[in-house]
């Protein structure tokens, strides 16, 4: 079995560990402004997912959810960060939920930023996947990279109620798609806080970094 290289990551600050996971076609740098606000009180680890940022990816067939979760575990092990609060935007939030389900001993809390749990309805799932395929073709992405953002099952939706750790939900005021997801989280998760950042859309952690950082500090500080 070929060993996958450890994902590139940034590691700043000291204190309780926050583990940041970005969204599709972003990279660790999207968290810079949030981490600038938090690194005085938290250890902030931010990864580049496979095929994103400084990570070259590993070729077609290597972007599935289980493999990427293994990549995140490898960073956790290398940094010896212990159990973490996972802070995920969009795709990163979905991966954070999956980690909390499959490896609950690694996760002490969830910061879900403009995130969703996937789809239980197969037709909705396929509509999402079609939109990802279209975007991948428009961007001329490396073969197979789109798989990282596609949904093949309803695992997270079906098992979300197993998650016991506290979650804080953060969404931009104009992010209507993921505002609906925030309602789903309140139904199934132990939501300790919900923050709507004014005048922000899906990239709320970039456009509204102070509000995102304040919500994370209030929930996990």
Labelled PLM ranges:
Residues 200-209:
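Catalytic histidine-centered segment of alpha/beta-hydrolase-like enzymes
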Residues 94-102, 107-136:
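Flexible "cap/lid" loop of the alpha/beta hydrolase fold
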């Amino acid at each position: 079995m070929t060993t996958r290289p450890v994902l590139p990551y940034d590691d700043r600050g000291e204190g309780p560990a926050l583990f940041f996971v970005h969204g599709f076609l972003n990279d660790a740098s999207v968290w810079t402004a949030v981490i600038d606000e938090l690194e005085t009180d938290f250890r902030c680890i931010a990864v580049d997912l496979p095929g994103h940022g400084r990570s070259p990816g590993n070729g077609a067939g290597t972007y599935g959810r289980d493999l990427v979760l293994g990549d995140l575990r490898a960073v956790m092990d290398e940094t010896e960060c212990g159990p973490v609060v996972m802070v995920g935007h969009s795709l990163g939030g979905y991966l954070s939920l999956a980690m909390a389900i499959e490896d609950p001993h690694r996760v002490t809390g969830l910061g879900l930023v403009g995130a969703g749990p996937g789809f239980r309805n197969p037709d909705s799932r396929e509509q999402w996947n079609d939109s990802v395929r279209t975007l991948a073709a428009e961007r001329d992405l490396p073969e197979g990279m789109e798989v990282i953002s596609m949904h093949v099952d309803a695992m997270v939706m079906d098992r979300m109620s197993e998650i016991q750790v506290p979650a804080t939900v953060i969404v931009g005021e104009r992010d209507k798609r993921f505002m609906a997801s925030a309602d789903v989280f309140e139904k199934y998760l132990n939501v300790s806080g919900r923050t709507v950042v004014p005048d922000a859309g899906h990239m709320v952690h970039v456009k509204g970094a102070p509000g995102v950082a304040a919500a994370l500090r209030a929930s996990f500080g």
